């Protein structure tokens, strides 16, 4: 979900990583 993506991004990960992690 979006919350996961936002947390991932704020933690300093890149877009592709967050898409995978939060899919």
Curated annotation (Swiss-Prot):
Annotated Pfam families? Toxin_25
GO MF term (any one): potassium channel regulator activity
Q: What else is known?
A: Negative results: has no effect on Kv1.1/KCNA1, Kv1.2/KCNA2 and Kv1.3/KCNA3 potassium channels, suggesting that the presence of an additional charged residue in a position adjacent to the dyad lysine impedes the functional block of Kv1 channels produced by this toxin.
Site Aromatic residue of the functional dyad: list residues. Answer: 5
Q: Which residues cross the membrane?
A: none
**Domain remark text:** Has the structural arrangement of two alpha-helices stabilized by disulfide bonds (CSalpha/alpha 2(S-S)).
Q: Which family does it belong to?
A: Belongs to the short scorpion toxin superfamily. Potassium channel inhibitor kappa-KTx family. Kappa-KTx 1 subfamily.
Describe the processing and modification events after translation.
Is not amidated.
> What compartments host this protein?
Secreted
| This protein's record includes keyword Cell inner membrane | no
Function description: Shows very weak blocking activity on voltage-gated potassium channels Kv10.1/KCNH1/EAG1 (6.2% inhibition by 40 uM of the toxin). Has no effect on the other voltage-gated potassium channels tested.
Look up what happens after changing residue 20 to E. Blocks Kv1.2/KCNA2 (IC(50)=36.8 uM) and Kv1.3/KCNA3 (IC(50)=53.7 uM), but not Kv1.1/KCNA1
What name does the UniProt record give this protein? Potassium channel toxin kappa-KTx 1.3
Q: Which UniProt keywords apply?
A: Disulfide bond, Ion channel impairing toxin, Potassium channel impairing toxin, Secreted, Toxin, Voltage-gated potassium channel impairing toxin
What tissues has this protein been observed in? Expressed by the venom gland.
Q: Where exactly is the site Basic residue of the functional dyad?
A: 19
Instruction: Please tell me whether the keyword Lipid biosynthesis is annotated for this protein.
Output: no
Q: Per the database entry, which stretches of residues form a coiled coil?
A: none
């Amino acid at each position: 979900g979006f919350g996961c993506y936002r947390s991932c991004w704020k933690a300093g990960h890149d877009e592709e990583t967050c898409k995978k992690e939060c899919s």
